[in-house]
From Swiss-Prot:
Attaches a formyl group to the free amino group of methionyl-tRNA(fMet). The formyl group appears to play a dual role in the initiator identity of N-formylmethionyl-tRNA by promoting its recognition by IF2 and preventing the misappropriation of this tRNA by the elongation apparatus. (6S)-5,6,7,8-tetrahydrofolate binds at residues 108-111. SUPFAM superfamilies: FMT C-terminal domain-like (SSF50486), Formyltransferase (SSF53328). Pfam families: Formyl_trans_C (PF02911), Formyl_trans_N (PF00551). The keyword Transmembrane helix does not apply. CDD domains: FMT_core_Met-tRNA-FMT_N, Met_tRNA_FMT_C. This is Methionyl-tRNA formyltransferase. It catalyses: L-methionyl-tRNA(fMet) + (6R)-10-formyltetrahydrofolate = N-formyl-L-methionyl-tRNA(fMet) + (6S)-5,6,7,8-tetrahydrofolate + H(+). Keywords: Protein biosynthesis, Transferase. Belongs to the Fmt family.
Amino acid sequence: MRIVFMGTGDIAIPAFRSLIRHSDLAGLVTQPDRPVGRHQVLTAPAIKNIAREAGIPVLQPHSLRSPDALSNLRRLNPDLIVVMAYGQILSQEVIDMAPMGCINAHASLLPRHRGAACIQSAIKSGDAETGITIMHIVRKLDAGDIIAQISTPLEGSETGGTLHDKLARMTPDVLLPVIHSIEKGTATRIRQQEILATYAPKLLRADGKIDWTRPAEEIGRMIRAYDPWPGTFTNYWNRKKRIRNMKIFPGFSILPEAEGKPGQVLSAGEQGLLIACGSGGLLVTDVQLEGSTRMNISQLIAGHPNLKDIHFDV
């Protein structure tokens, strides 16, 4: 069974490597090389380099809707198309191209957290578990029939980054058996319950602004979920009465008994910066001021002795 893999994000790499080892991989479709960094160096997706090393043909169309892109994809003659973190919405023509189907590996337990920010959303929502879903692709976002799922508990210490890596490692454990069942004609199809669907749209940097009127527990989940992307930040007024920005990183503690006006600095010491929330307080230990580098609270206090007078915007 000839398989074409479509993927760009690093979360897709373990699945792609497993297909190189255990299947007849006809090709990789990934996003075009992009300018990266301050100097805008044209950089290939990491998965492209892996494919090249393995001698796998690579397609990088700007749009899979163009006649040339569709023609090149047909020439790979796929029996099955497998998608994970590709980055383009597929047309019905692509979905129907492979006779054995077009399936997707999605990093949540569907129908919960449909969309691009599924990993962050599971942490931010305080879910007890999350996982990987293998499903048939349909035109509606992440709404296709489920073939299989694998789950993992959320322990309350994960960040968006650590959970991303864990789910990436888990994917081959559910994907390979699904592919074998499709080849044998024994794959199951379970319709998603629309009434249970939730959505996790793509995040922007502005989504990381902290609302200090929210409970400390909720803000803490947001900080963990949005690390490393899009990050969390808060604004404050400096001595020159200009609004400044401060990023906040995981490494905090939650103090349920703390009381104060949301955004108020209750204390500033070696243990951290205690900020009042809508309920409870957040003891922050690692921050980054606008135009500076990441630092601990001791370093922050050394350069800003009047932290107690700061009030963060809600």
